[in-house]
């Protein structure tokens, strides 16, 4: 029998913040990765994490999921400190979905087989399982590619499938790691619309990270700029664009928001 315990899904309280990183610090050897970092995701918010490669964005995701633990500070989900909770408890009990930058699916299975495989793990009711698969195929317009193996899909199609798979368990919090990386302009626009629609229609709280500000800022309510393991600025996209000179002080002249 499986050693994984059964956990009762937590009902998210009617409060503003669903996730907080409170004074979180982390070192890898002598390298300071996160330095007394504070971050908050509000209910129904789309929060963007901006920063150069190595700034600590993916590390924040790994901390939220429980893949690594902080040296100091607290990770709080739905008003509960979860530092010692393993990944399966966090993702199941607190309904966290994750869409990685690369992969997130079985390459040798078709789109439909991928959806079916994850649904069989996460949904016990057979009729709802079929309903969920069909609704995601419809929502993401996957029907033309449902019988194609994931390995043969385009970059944009793979990203759609990966997001759809993350949504099978009806998450309350969704993490999107570099969702626009290496995609063409039209595909990025489609994915931006998908992200905004997910928040509006499903009331999901979303965090997405990217190093391209102009792509991320078009679909978030608020963005936090991560530099040297700290949040050096957090504001609305409009205010960050106006405060461009302050951002260049951290990222140099190559940092372009517009």
Please provide the spans of the model-predicted regions.
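Conserved structural motif at the start of ABC-family nucleotide-binding domains
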Residues: 19-21, 34
């Amino acid at each position: 029998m499986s050693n994984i315990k059964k956990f009762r899904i937590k009902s998210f309280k009617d409060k503003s913040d669903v996730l907080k990183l409170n004074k979180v610090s982390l070192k890898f050897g002598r390298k300071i990765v996160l330095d007394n970092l504070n971050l908050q995701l509000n209910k129904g918010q789309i929060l963007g994490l901006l920063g150069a490669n190595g700034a600590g964005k993916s590390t924040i995701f790994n901390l939220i999921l429980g893949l690594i633990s902080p040296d100091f500070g607290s990770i709080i989900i739905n008003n509960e400190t979860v530092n010692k909770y393993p990944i399966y408890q966090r993702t199941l009990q607190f309904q966290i979905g994750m869409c990685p930058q690369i992969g997130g699916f079985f390459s040798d299975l078709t789109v439909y087989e991928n959806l079916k495989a994850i649904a069989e793990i996460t949904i016990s009711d057979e009729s709802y399982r079929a309903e969920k698969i069909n609704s995601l195929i419809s929502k993401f317009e996957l029907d033309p590619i449902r019988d194609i193996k994931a390995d043969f899909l385009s970059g944009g199609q793979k990203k759609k499938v990966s997001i759809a798979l993350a949504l099978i368990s009806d998450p309350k919090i969704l993490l999107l790691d570099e969702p626009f990386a290496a995609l063409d302009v039209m595909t990025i626009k489609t994915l931006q619309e998908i992200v905004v629609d997910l928040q509006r229609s499903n009331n999901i709280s979303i965090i997405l990270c990217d190093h391209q500000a102009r792509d991320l800022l078009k679909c978030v309510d608020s963005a936090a700029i991560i530099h040297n393991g700290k949040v050096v600025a957090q504001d609305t996209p409009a205010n960050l664009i106006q405060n461009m000179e302050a951002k260049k002080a951290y990222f140099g002249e190559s940092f372009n928001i517009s």
